[in-house]
Amino acid sequence: MALKIGIIGPTNIKKLSKLTKKPASFFLDKAQEIGEILATIPCELWINSDKGIAFQIARAYKKNKGKKLVILYPAKGRPWPKKHTEIYKKFADKLRKEENWFWTNYNVIDKPDICICVGLSSGTLSELAYIKWNYQFKRERPKKLIAIRELLRDKKLPPEIEVEIKKIITYLNTTTDLEKFLKEV
């Protein structure tokens, strides 16, 4: 069975660029690199149907012959609209229709074996909170959270989350460290 890898990260690359004082091209280049790395290992890539870094990673993954892209999307636009998600669904090898946005955001961290955090945003913080609660209530999903320091504002996760899940966090300094880590998993 292939390793399932979920990606969580910002949808607004322009805002991320402003907050981190790094050019948008830095994040786009890193997304390309991560997608290329993930395409070299036998894994399923899980993302939400939205723009941003996760989608850019997924595009690079597919461009480099990644085996299976699973895209989650909400069946109902509640409590937030979903029309903007439609254009991303066509890239999927497998579509997972979730009941609503909660289940879409939750299952991108709960169904994969490993979750990779590629930057912070308000949406990413909610997904990190779901990981924290899964860990607190011994759901053991995901089994490992990878956080890439060069993509995080302060090179770490928020301490309110980090302190609760430190046993499952692996920090990697750069995206190039990801390939070595995944080959050892």
Residues of each region from the PLM?
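Generic structural signal for short, solvent-exposed loop/turn connectors between secondary structure elements
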Residues: 1, 184-185
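N-terminal nucleotide-binding beta1-loop-alpha1 segment
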Residues: 1-14
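Nucleotide donor/acceptor-binding cores
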Residues: 2-5, 43, 143
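Acidic/glycine-enriched connector segments
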Residues: 13-15, 22, 28-39, 47-157
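General structural signal for secondary-structure boundaries
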Residues: 19-20, 25-26, 159-161, 170, ...
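Short active-site oxyanion
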Residues: 42-45, 167-168
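Short acidic-hydrophobic, aromatic-tinged amphipathic segments that line or gate anion-handling sites
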Residues: 94-102, 166-184
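Accessory alpha-helical/coil subdomains and C-terminal extensions
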Residues: 143-144, 153-170, 178-181
